C-alpha cells in the first residue's frame, strides 16, 4: 500500500517522494514534506508549493478513487485514503492470509549469509547470547518472508587455548570430585556445576585406561569430549528459543585451509614479520594498528581463525554477509574487513551488527546467577521462568545496539504493562467475538465495507500497514519496529473494542471484518518474531 501510493505520487510529480505517517491521525493516513525539498528549486514558499501540488494530485486521473482528501497543511501535503481503496486492499490481504506482507523472489532479492551466536562451546548459553540469537533468527525469518535467500550459520570455535582450558578444567574437577584428590586450580579456569557434571559423566563414559595416560593426552581427550557435550547443550538451549541453524562451521575444519589463505595474504603483501610474530597490515584499511596473526610460540591468534573463516564464507559469493557479534567485539570489524580486502573481496559486502548488554531484574533486584554456570544467567533458566515467546518479544523490543534492561516479573502481569500479554489479549478478544457472532467467517469475509467512521477506517489502515513495518524493520535492521507495530495495533484495537458495541449492531459484519484484518496482521507480525499468537487467554496465562 505504501509502495503503491509512493509510486503514484512520483509518477504524477516526477520527483522522488518521501511518504511519512502524520503525527496527528486527524491529518490523514500519509503525509509528504516534498514542498520543503522543492522550495529552493522553485524559489517559493513551501506553503505555496504544497497548495499547488495538492491541487495537482487531487485532480489527477490516477488518484481518482484513491484518496478521500489531499490537503496542504503548513507546507506538508496530507492524504486520507478512500474507503474503496482500503476495502480492495483488505480483500486482497485476507485472501493472502499468512502470506500477507510477503514478497515473491525477484531481481531485487538478495542472497544473504547470516552468522550469529557463534558462542564458544565451553559452557551453556547465557542470557547475553540470547539477544543476538533471537535477533538473528527473526531477521532471517523476515528476510525470507521478503523473498531473500538466507543461510544461517553458527561458527564453532572448537580448537585453541579455550578448548584446552575446558579440558584442563574438567580434568581438575575429575581429580577433585571423582578421585577425591586435593587440587590447585589455575588463576583462570572454567567453573560451575556443569564442569563437575562433565567430569562425572566422563568417568562413566570413557575408558578407565584413559585416566592412566599422561596428563596432556587426558586433557586432549577431555577437551574434545567436553566440547561435544557443550555443543549438544547449546543446540538444546537454542531449540528452547525456537532457533535452528542451517549449518555449523567447525574452526578445526576451517583451519585446514590456513596455508592457502596465508599464501594469498603473502602474495598481496599483507603480512610482515616483527618481534618473532607475523603481522597483518590492517592499518592500511582504517584499522587503528596492525594485528598479530601468528604469535612468538607459533600459535595463532583469535583473529587468524576469523580471517580464514571469512575467506571460506566469501568464496561462496553471497550478495551480503551479516555477522551479529557482541558489542565487545567491535574492535574486530576493521581488522576482519582489512583481511577481506587483502584477499581480494569487497569488504563492503560484510555488515556487522553489534548486540549490546542485557541486564535482567526480578522484583527490581538483579536476576539470580546460575549456580550451575557460575557467574552467568542461563537462557534455560529464564525460558523456564517467563516462557520462550515473552523472552523473544522483550529481546526484540529495543534496538540491538542499545542496552536492554527489564524486570522479568513484568512479563508475568496480565495487564497493559505487559506488552506481549496485551497483544495476545487483543487477538483473544477478536476470536471470542467471532465465536459468539451469529455470522460465519465466510459471511464476514464477503461483506463490503461501506459505512465506516474515521476511527474504524484508521484501525483498518493500521492493520493494512504491516507490509511497511516488515520492510522497514529489515532495511534498517530495526526489528523493534515490528514489536512497536504490534503494540500500537493492539492498543488501537482495544480502544476500538472499548468504544462501543461490535456485536449486535447493523455494522457487525463490517466491524468483524476489520477485526479479522487486525488478527491477521498481529498473527503475521508475531510469526516473523518467532512467536505463536494466542487465540484464547486462560487464567494461567
Swiss-Prot record:
According to its UniProt entry, this protein's organism is Helicobacter pylori (strain G27)
Family, similarity comment: Belongs to the class-I aminoacyl-tRNA synthetase family.
- Which processes are annotated in GO (biological process)? arginyl-tRNA aminoacylation
Q: List the protein's name.
A: Arginine--tRNA ligase
Q: What is its EC number?
A: 6.1.1.19
The cellular component terms of Gene Ontology attached to this UniProt record, alphabetical and capped at eight, are:
cytoplasm
Name the reaction it catalyses: tRNA(Arg) + L-arginine + ATP = L-arginyl-tRNA(Arg) + AMP + diphosphate
Q: A single Pfam family, by name? A: DALR_1
What GO annotations for molecular function exist for this entry? arginine-tRNA ligase activity; ATP binding
> Gene3D superfamilies from the entry?
Arginyl tRNA synthetase N-terminal domain, HUPs, Isoleucyl-tRNA Synthetase, Domain 1
Q: Whom does it interact with, and what assembly results?
A: Monomer.
Motif 'HIGH' region positions after renumbering to this chain:
119-129
- Keyword terms, alphabetized: Aminoacyl-tRNA synthetase, ATP-binding, Cytoplasm, Ligase, Nucleotide-binding, Protein biosynthesis
Q: Give the subcellular location.
A: Cytoplasm
Which EC class is the enzyme in? Answer: ligase
Please give the HAMAP family that the UniProt record associates with this protein. Arg_tRNA_synth
Q: Which domain of life is it from?
A: Bacteria
Amino acid at each position: 500500500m505504501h509502495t503503491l501510493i509512493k509510486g503514484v505520487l512520483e509518477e504524477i510529480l516526477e520527483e522522488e517522494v518521501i511518504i511519512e505517517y502524520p503525527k496527528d491521525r486527524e491529518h490523514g493516513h500519509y503525509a509528504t514534506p516534498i514542498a520543503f525539498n522543492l522550495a529552493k528549486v522553485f524559489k517559493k514558499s513551501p506553503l505555496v508549493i504544497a497548495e499547488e501540488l495538492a491541487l495537482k494530485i487531487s485532480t489527477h486521473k490516477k488518484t481518482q478513487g484513491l484518496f478521500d482528501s489531499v490537503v496542504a497543511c503548513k507546507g506538508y501535503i496530507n492524504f486520507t485514503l478512500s474507503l474503496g481503496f482500503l476495502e480492495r486492499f483488505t480483500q486482497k490481504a485476507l485472501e493472502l492470509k499468512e502470506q500477507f506482507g510477503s514478497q515473491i523472489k525477484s531481481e531485487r532479492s538478495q542472497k544473504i549469509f547470516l552468522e550469529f551466536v557463534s558462542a564458544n562451546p565451553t559452557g551453556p548459553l547465557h542470557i547475553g547470547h540470547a539477544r543476538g540469537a533471537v535477533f538473528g533468527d527473526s531477521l532471517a525469518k523476515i528476510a525470507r518472508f521478503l523473498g531473500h535467500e538466507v543461510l544461517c550459520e553458527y561458527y564453532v570455535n572448537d580448537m585453541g587455548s579455550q578448548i584446552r582450558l575446558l579440558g584442563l578444567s574438567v580434568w581438575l574437577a575429575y581429580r577433585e570430585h571423582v578421585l577425591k584428590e586435593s587440587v590447585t586450580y589455575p588463576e583462570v579456569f572454567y567453573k560451575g556445576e556443569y564442569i563437575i557434571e562433565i567430569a562425572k559423566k566422563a568417568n562413566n563414559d570413557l575408558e578407565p585406561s584413559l585416566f592412566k595416560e599422561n596428563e596432556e593426552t587426558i586433557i586432549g581427550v577431555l577437551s574434545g569430549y567436553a566440547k561435544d557435550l557443550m555443543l549438544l547443550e547449546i543446540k538444546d538451549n537454542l531449540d528452547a528459543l525456537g532457533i535452528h541453524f542451517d549449518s555449523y562451521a567447525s574452526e578445526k575444519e576451517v583451519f585446514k585451509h590456513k596455508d592457502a589463505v596465508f599464501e594469498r595474504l603473502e602474495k598481496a603483501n599483507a603480512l610482515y614479520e616483527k618481534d618473532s610474530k607475523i603481522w597483518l597490515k590492517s592499518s592500511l584499511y582504517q584499522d587503528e594498528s596492525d594485528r598479530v596473526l601468528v604469535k612468538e610460540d607459533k600459535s595463532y591468534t583469535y583473529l587468524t581463525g576469523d580471517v580464514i573463516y571469512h575467506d571460506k564464507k566469501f568464496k561462496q559469493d553471497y550478495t551480503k554477509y551479516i555477522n551479529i557479534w557482541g558489542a565487545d567485539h567491535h574492535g574486530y570489524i576493521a581488522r576482519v574487513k582489512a583481511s577481506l580486502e587483502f584477499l581480494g573481496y569487497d569488504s563492503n559486502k560484510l555488515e556487522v551488527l553489534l548486540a549490546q548488554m542485557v541486564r535482567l531484574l526480578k522484583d527490581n533486584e538483579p536476576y539470580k546467577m546460575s549456580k550451575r554456570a557460575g557467574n552467568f544467567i542461563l537462557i534455560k533458566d529464564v525460558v523456564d521462568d517467563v516462557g520462550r515467546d515473552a523472552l523473544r518479544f522483550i529481546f526484540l523490543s529495543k534496538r540491538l545496539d542499545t542496552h536492554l534492561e527489564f524486570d522479568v516479573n513484568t512479563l508475568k502481569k496480565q495487564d497493559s504493562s505487559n506488552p506481549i500479554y496485551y497483544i495476545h489479549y487483543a487477538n483473544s478478544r477478536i476470536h471470542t467475538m467471532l465465536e459468539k457472532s451469529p455470522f460465519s467467517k465466510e459471511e464476514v469475509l464477503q461483506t463490503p465495507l461501506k459505512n465506516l467512521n474515521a476511527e474504524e477506517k484508521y484501525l483498518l489502515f493500521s492493520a493494512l500497514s504491516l507490509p511497511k513495518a516488515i520492510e522497514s524493520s529489515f532495511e534498517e535492521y530495526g526489528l523493534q519496529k515490528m514489536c512497536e507495530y504490534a503494540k500500537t495495533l493492539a492498543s488501537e484495537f482495544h480502544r476500538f473494542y472499548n468504544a462501543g458495541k461490535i456485536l449486535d449492531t447493523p455494522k457487525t459484519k463490517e466491524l468483524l471484518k476489520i477485526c479479522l484484518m487486525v488478527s491477521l496482521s498481529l498473527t503475521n507480525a508475531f510469526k516473523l518474531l518467532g512467536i505463536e499468537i494466542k487465540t484464547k487467554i486462560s487464567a494461567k496465562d
